Amino acid sequence: IVFGDWSSDVCSSDLVSSVNVEKTLEARPIADAGRGLQGTMPGLSVVIPSGEIGSDPIMKIRGQIGSLQGGSSPLILVDNVEIPSIQMLNPDDIESISILKDAASASIYGAKAAFGVILITTKKGAKNQGVTVSYNGNLSFQNISKKMDMAGLDALEYTLAAFERVGGTVAGAFWMVTREGYEKAVEWQEKWGDVVGPDDPMVFGRDWYVDANSRKIGLRTYDPYYYMVKEWTPTQLHNFSVNGKSGNTDYNISLGYLDQTGLIKPSKIDDFKRYNGSIKLGTQVTDWLRVNVGALYSKRNKRYAYATNSTTADPWLYIYRWGPTYPMTTEDGDPTRNPAYEMSVANTAFQMNNYASMNGGLEITPMKNWNINFDYTYS
């Protein structure tokens, strides 16, 4: 690392870690470099805030915590150029990744690097004469990694016991729970729990009944995860590159495409697409002068059900709010206003992000171990 006009070796306390890109990123199908780094490097914390496809990972170095109003994210540099999100970079274009912690990085890169720096270098042109054309693609499948166990009969018993403790005899809303109803729900589970499917219609007398006080008592329990989350979804990745050298000019041209389907079952559309393109050219004009130019383009499209507005709340909140006997349909088979229904009729939201950068630079070597670099980037 160069400090002004002198250089020094980086000690282990300054450089948190270097990534073996071949083993970490290239050996497995990943949607973006951030997710690929999760759990692979000491000192680097990568958290995916939700299971939403296309969501940016939250990255922190050594657990840095900022102020209440300020951020604590590290500075991300790709070929010495800052980018707003690591997700816009095609993992197949990465040649090396290094992590610098706050003290060393702030002295080099300034205040923006107070919480560390992620240094990413992209692939360059070939060192030997010739051209290499390559393609790699894969089809992978994903499922939910952690499923919360939704309470069934035990939730009914807890709710009823809480009401009885304060002198009540009936609990719930829309579909009520009484002591008699709870005992019949236990019988329903023993008799019908393994027989009635989640999509089977409701049957009066079997799944619910009306008591002497004209209250609807629900007996059948539901697992909202079945209605909200798919068992698996596909992801496809395609990468094409041309790498070579002709005379004193070396080059690397690459294209990438990611198509990912989300796990939300009732959504009309739930997908994420990313398009990447990059080019790097370098020419050794003389023994002491090298000219470099490059360009980077990234486009991200995300489509999802927008089911939260002024009259609705987060469907995932209502999954845990409603009791296990709250039905997915009315006794006539019409859908109730439940989380799955809200998402199935919601409008589709479109989120598009475009990023482009162009750069050019000169590398002057007047003598051995003395390199002078001039770089200009427009993004």
Residue ranges of each PLM-predicted region?
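Outer-membrane beta-barrel pore domains and translocons
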Residues: 136-140, 256-258, 296-298, 359, ...
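Short, small/polar-rich motifs associated with maturation and membrane association
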Residues: 7-277, 290-291
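Small-side-chain secondary-structure face that scaffolds active or pore-lining regions
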Residues: 262-274, 284, 296, 304-309, ...
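Short, exposed "boundary/linker" segments that immediately precede the start
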Residues: 1-5
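Outer-membrane beta-barrel and related beta-rich outer-membrane complex signature
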Residues: 144-153, 265-267, 292-321, 378-379
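Acidic/polar loop-and-plug regions of large Gram-negative outer-membrane beta-barrel proteins
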Residues: 177, 183, 194-195, 199, ...
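Outer-membrane beta-barrel transmembrane strands
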Residues: 230-249, 256, 341-379
